[in-house]
Curated annotation (Swiss-Prot):
Protein name (Swiss-Prot/TrEMBL): PX domain-containing protein EREX
Superkingdom field: Eukaryota
Keyword annotations of the record: Coiled coil, Cytoplasm, Endosome, Lipid-binding, Membrane, Protein transport, Transport
Organism: Arabidopsis thaliana (Mouse-ear cress)
Region span, Disordered: 36-85, 252-273
Length: 755
């Protein structure tokens, strides 16, 4: 969101503000350059100013396709300004920046110093850093403004930019350290780090054009301050203008006129040289600041004063003489036969108006509040024989206007028509000189900018080396201090160790004394021990004799043990032979055990298969029994001995009986197949299974007998139906039930056929 899109100021509406900055802010380029397309050219932000477009060829219409660059006309900041690297030294209005100022408005940021200011009357003073925002116009005029910011403000700016530009890799902000003592060196280091961080941050074009930066640096206030300074200086320099200009201001609102007498041209050309030099200096001083905006304006004024095209001293005398003669009378139109020829100035709206004259003395008494020399106009020829200006040249409208006038842009310089050819020749010569001087000046400026850039780079490197040297010096100093502290700690530790060693020496001396006492006691004890040793030696001799006796007895026992060992070896051999026989018997028994386990498992499997077969047989018998029950045909026996079927016709009843016979035949065939499967199972299982096989056989026979009986019953019913011994029930209210039974029979039959 652009904070400056709808924040219009007094400068935007051009409310009675004169000077080059009085134009609407949409005209960003106030001087002719490669992007200036004429007098009526408006600065449009979305226009792509490529190199071809600046030279008259068709510019690139797709401005969004090209990457953004400095002064490309897309900056949303006030006046479309862009960040630039700061100059080496700020030298006021004529500061030289390391770039071409004609490209557009620029701003730079430096942190020159800091100041201690109290937040309130009670609190302690806090450190505020002076942030200097310098602005340079396309004319090369520099203005600066200071903004006070705390260190926390810089950190808040960093966090806000980090949130807005998430994908950008931002330079790290200076670390926040607690300054217990406000040392000048530490504050200076922090100031340098803040300035370097701001320049590295603003080197990104997107960040330098963001609203956060504009708000933090108060760029709009800086622009207003620039224009206020410009306006104040214009006011100061405009005090000498009324005495130099031959203009009169009428008391009638909305009208003005200039009347000039050229009765004696020869006298005009022989004016005082000193007066001309003074006027020339004043005019040059007046229009020096607008020379870059409109080049022809300053050249014409210099020509008028330098080459004597208009003698101002005689000019003022003629005006005074005319004013004393006419007084306050209104001036008429000038004719050829008149004694004096007057020149009327055409207003910008095209209407020729005549105004009363004021004397030069009244003009000098008038308070001059504003002055402007920016807009070029082309005056028309007024009456035959009047002085005019060549159609291709544009005059410079300038004048001194009081605080109550509204026609400050409606006046222009006029001169004699006889001097036109001389003026043209001089203008052409000066134009050539001016172009050559401009080319040389641009070359020198480019070289100077290169030298300044190199010097600035070298100064930056030197400053970085100084900062690095200072940091190294501080680190070395801190290291030495730390080393000294460590050595002091080690010295104190050694002193404590020496004290401990002294204590240990005293303890060792006391311990040695005690050892000496013990040694004397031990010597006395040793004497007693020697006597005891002699007694022990005698006892040892006695024990040795006993040992020899025991050794002899042991040898005898060993001989006996060897004999017994031989006997035991023989017994072990016999046991080993018996052990091999037992192992063979054990292996045979294990084989028999495995065989029995296989047989038992086989029997278990056979019983399991038999159980499954029995379950399957019972299930199939149940299924066959149900299917046999489905083959029944419903009959009702009445008292007269007639059978009544639930059928709508006789043919349908016969069809049902035939279907039932077919199904019963299929059931008999399936039962026979089941009995054959039972026989096969009996053969595969081997031998007789006893009662289970008999039960299976009986079940199959019972099913077959029932099926045959049903088939015989159906044949009997068919015969009786063919003899018309059975009556058919009329279809009535039970039609739905009969249709359901027929559908059920058909469904069962289809299932049987599918099987």
């Amino acid at each position: 969101m652009n904070l400056y899109a709808h924040d219009l100021s007094l400068l935007d509406f051009n409310y009675n503000v004169s000077g080059p900055f009085g134009e609407p802010l949409s005209h960003r380029f106030l001087s002719p350059g490669p992007f200036f397309q004429g007098e009526e050219d408006d600065y449009r932000r979305n226009t792509s100013y490529s190199h071809d477009g600046a030279n008259g060829r068709e510019p690139d219409t797709d401005s969004r396709a090209s990457p953004p660059h400095r002064h490309d006309g897309r900056s949303p900041l006030p006046l479309g300004m862009d960040w630039s690297s700061p100059p080496r030294h700020l030298e006021g209005r004529d500061t030289v920046w390391p770039h071409d100022h004609r490209t557009g408005w620029s701003y730079c940021v430096t942190v020159p110093s800091w100041v201690d200011l109290p937040k309130s009357s009670v609190s302690d003073p806090a450190v505020f850093y002076r942030v200097q925002v310098a602005i340079q116009s396309p004319e090369g005029i520099t203005s600066a403004r200071l903004v006070l910011r705390r260190f926390n403000d810089f950190l808040e700016l960093y966090s806000s930019i980090k949130k807005e530009f998430v994908k950008k890799s931002l330079p790290q902000a200076p670390p926040k350290k607690i300054l217990r003592m406000r040392n000048q060196t530490l504050l200076e280091e922090r100031r340098c780090s803040l300035e370097d961080w701001m320049n590295r941050l603003l080197s990104d074009i997107d960040i330098s054009r963001s609203a956060l930066i504009a708000t933090f640096l108060e760029l709009e206030a800086a622009v207003r301050s620039y224009f206020n300074d410009e306006y104040q200086e214009t006011e100061d320099t405009s005090g000498d203008i009324p005495s130099l200009l031959p203009t009169t201001i009428s008391d009638v609102p909305g009208s003005s006129s200039v009347t000039i007498d050229h009765d004696n041209d020869s006298a005009d050309e022989t004016s005082n040289a000193s007066t001309m030099k003074h006027d020339e200096a004043n005019l040059k001083n007046l229009f020096s600041r607008n020379s870059t905006a409109v080049d022809n304006v300053t050249d014409w004024h210099e020509l008028i004063t330098e080459y004597g095209l208009l003698d101002q001293s005689s000019f003022q005398e003629k005006v005074e003489r005319l004013s004393s003669t006419n007084g306050d009378a209104a001036t008429g139109t000038v004719t050829r036969g008149g004694i004096s020829s007057g020149v009327g100035i055409q207003r910008l709206d095209g209407s020729d108006r005549k105004f009363q004259e004021l004397t030069i003395e009244s003009i000098k008494k008038t308070h001059v509040s504003d002055f402007e020399a920016s807009t070029a106009v082309e005056p028309d020829l007024v009456n035959q024989g009047a002085m005019d200006i060549h159609g291709e040249a544009h005059g410079n409208m300038y004048g001194a206007v009081g605080g109550d006038t509204e026609t400050q842009k409606d006046l222009a310089i006029v001169f004699q028509s006889e001097e036109r050819h001389k003026l043209k020749r001089v203008i052409d010569t000066l134009k050539q000189r001016l172009e050559t001087a401009k080319a040389d000046t641009e070359d020198l400026i480019s070289r100077l900018n290169q030298e300044l850039a190199v010097r600035q780079f070298l100064s930056t490197k030197v400053r970085d080396l100084e900062v690095e040297l200072e940091t190294t010096r501080e680190s070395c100093k801190q290291g030495m201090e730390k080393t000294v502290l460590d050595e002091k700690e080690r010295f104190t530790q050694i002193q404590w160790d020496m004290e401990e060693l002294r204590k240990q020496c005293m303890e060792m001396e006391s311990f040695l004394n005690s050892i000496k006492d013990e040694k004397t006691h031990i010597e006395t004890a040793n004497e007693s021990l020697v006597q005891e040793n002699q007694m022990l030696l005698q006892q040892i001799n006695d024990i040795r004799e006993n040992f020899e006796n025991f050794h002899k007895e042991h040898e005898e026992l060993e001989v006996k043990a060897k004999a017994e060992l031989k006997v035991l070896v023989k017994e072990v051999k016999s046991l080993r032979t018996t052990q091999s026989d037992l192992r063979q018997e054990l292996s045979g028994i294990m084989k028999e055990k495995l065989e029995m386990e296989r047989i038992v498992q086989r029997e278990k499997d056979r019983e399991e298969t038999a159980k499954n077969a029995d379950k399957k047989l019972l299930h199939e018998c149940d299924v066959l029994q149900n299917r046999l029950q489905e083959c029944n045909v419903k009959f009702d026996i009445e008292e007269e001995g007639k059978l009544i079927m639930d059928s709508s016709s006789l043919s349908e009843a016969i069809e049902l009986l035939a279907t039932s016979d077919n199904r019963i035949g299929l059931l008999i065939a399936e039962t026979q197949l089941l009995s054959e499967e039972v026989e096969k199972l009996k053969l595969t299982s081997g031998g007789h299974r006893g009662t289970d096989d008999l039960v299976r056989k009986m079940l199959t026979e019972v099913l077959i007998d029932n099926a045959r009986l049903r088939k015989q019953v159906n044949s009997v019913l068919r015969c009786s139906l063919s003899g018309h011994g059975i009556s058919v029930r009329e279809a009535g209210t039970e039609v739905d039930d009969e249709e359901g039974s027929i559908d059920l029979a058909r469904t069962v039959m289809s299932k049987i056929l599918e099987k």
